[in-house]
Design a protein with these regions (language model features):
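Helix-to-loop junction immediately C-terminal to a conserved catalytic motif
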Residues: 48
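Hydrophobic anchor residue at the start of the ABC signature
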Residues: 148
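ABC ATPase NBD coupling module
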Residues: 65-81
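Conserved ABC ATPase "signature" region
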Residues: 113-130
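ABC ATPase C-loop
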Residues: 151-152
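Q-loop/switch helix immediately C-terminal to the Walker
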Residues: 86, 93-105
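Conserved ABC transporter NBD signature motif
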Residues: 56-66
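Conserved ABC ATPase signature
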Residues: 134-142
């Protein structure tokens, strides 16, 4: 399995996190979780090792991120792509340079391989016309697409998406989901509103609120609006 949480609660848990969270995500699956922003962001912080759980256990790619030394946390994060809130793009760098950053920080990758990977996502995500522009000057939908491309440029084993498609149209959402699944092994996406396209493309859909975490199955209609 890629991810396993067992009876997890964070320190200073938000009001909505009333019950311990248990969750298992298998390899090459796509999970969508309908939740509120604070729960999604805290969950991803636990997965990325940015905070330790107050109780329970977190296993990510066979590692306990909250217990790892800093260098090993960085190594684990190099295998995880993410689009969080805010998106973390560097506004005064070009799109091309933003795409290069996660590869530059990855050890052992030569310049030719960096360029090959960047060109691959530039072509797939349709970014050629904006590669020299800066994210600070892009509309919201284009910026979200750049953030997705940057998250998958390293072909991560796990991709974390925190409500990443809020500014993107329905047709484009379906295309971007397919690209994320192509470049990343396993995807976990949160959404803060009803998103039928996400639900329809997911292997599993869940609802998580103050009542707890519960599976909603595969049918988009089972998730309340």
């Amino acid at each position: 399995m890629i991810l396993a949480l067992r009876d997890v609660r964070p320190f200073d848990a938000p009001e909505q996190w009333r019950h311990p969270l248990s969750l298992v995500v298998e390899e090459n699956s796509f999970l969508v979780v309908r939740t509120v922003p604070v729960l999604g962001s805290r969950l991803f912080r636990l997965i990325l090792g940015a905070e330790r759980p107050a109780s329970g256990s977190v296993s990510v790619l066979d590692k306990a991120p909250g217990d790892l030394p800093r260098q090993e946390v960085r190594a684990l994060r190099s295998r995880i792509g993410s689009v969080l809130i805010p998106d973390g793009l560097v506004g005064n760098m070009t799109v091309w340079r933003n795409l290069a950053l996660p590869l530059i920080f990855a050890s052992g990758m030569d310049e030719d391989e960096v360029e090959r990977r960047i060109e691959r996502v530039v072509e797939a995500f349709g970014l050629d016309d904006i590669r020299t522009r800066r994210p600070a000057n892009l509309p919201a939908d284009a910026r979200q697409i750049v953030a997705l491309a940057r998250a998958v440029v390293g072909s991560p084993s796990l991709l974390l998406l925190d409500d990443p498609l809020a500014s993107v149209g329905t047709v484009e959402t379906g295309r971007l989901i397919a690209l994320c699944r192509h470049f990343a092994g396993t995807v976990i996406a949160t959404t803060h509103r009803r998103n039928t396209v996400l639900y329809e493309n997911a292997d599993d859909v869940a609802l998580w609120d103050e009542s707890g975490y519960r599976d909603a199955g595969h049918a988009a209609g089972q998730v309340a609006s």
